[in-house]
Amino acid sequence: IDKYVKTGKARFVYRHFAFLGPESGWAAEAANCANAQDKFWQYHDYLFNYIWDNYYAKGKSGENVGAFAKDNLKKFAADLGLDTAKFNSCLDSGKYADAVAKETEEGRQAGVNGTPATFVNGRLISGAVPFSQFEAAVEAALSGNK
């Protein structure tokens, strides 16, 4: 990010890919509700740390077992100091459900079938890969090579 985005050489666009059932959709909606209070990345990071610490690091699946039930998502917002009345109203309204569904469908149409998935100049890089692989793809795009 520092080397390419902050210098204006590249653009970073985050899109949700909520493919693991209802809880992943609610989590994406909740992140958008946090974004309405300028806390997207804090909320995003909280969710990823929570699921890692409480499930994946213990060898358990956190998928649709209540980890991202709406009550928990609301508690996380409170933990981060968000305006809970606004956040809860936003999440309960389903205000971002269509946007999350649209981003997920666009991802499917582009060939995404899991996360993380990253596109560099239209080329899909699937899975967690070393930074050097991203760097090579960005450098190739900047030099005009796909």
Describe every region a protein language model picked out.
Residues 1-78, 110, 140-141:
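Structural alpha/beta surface segment adjacent to cysteine/selenocysteine redox centers
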Residues 1-6, 65-146:
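C-terminal cap of thioredoxin/glutaredoxin-like
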